[in-house]
Every structure is written in C-alpha cells, then in structure tokens.
From Swiss-Prot:
The keyword Phosphoprotein does not apply. Expressed by the venom duct. Residues 1-26 form the signal peptide. It holds the Pfam family Conotoxin_I2. It is found in: Secreted. This is Conotoxin Lt11.2. Disulfide bonds join 27-41, 34-46, 40-50, 45-54. InterPro entries: Conotoxin-I_CS, Conotoxin_I2. It comes from Conus litteratus (Lettered cone).
Amino acid sequence: MMFRLTSVSCFLLFIVFLNLVVLTNACIPEGTYCQFNADCCLSQCCWGSCGNPCRFPGKREKLQEFFRQR
C-alpha cells in the first residue's frame, strides 16, 4: 500500500512540475518574433517583435535593419 501511495504521489508531483514549466515558458522575451501582445512577457508586439515601448523606426533604423538582415 505504501509503494502505491508513493508512486501516485510522485506521478502527481511530476504532472505539477510539467505544468509549472509550461507556465514559466509561456511568454517570450523582448526582441524576439511575436504575433500578438499576449505572446510577449511585459512588452507589446510591434511589427512582429516584442518591444517595450513600441518604437517608431526612422530612416536610419530601417536602413540598419536592412543591412542586418543581409
């Protein structure tokens, strides 16, 4: 009886641990690709990447981004 109780306890503890891992990895950090505001941890999804606050890029920033992608 004790073995069964221990096995069930370990199994339930494992399930709780997996749920915690999923909850802690639910958001993505700033600067990574996103589709919705809910994807970002504390940021907003701006033009496909997490940023806080949303930055409106100027000509120089757009040009630098163009060269970074090359």
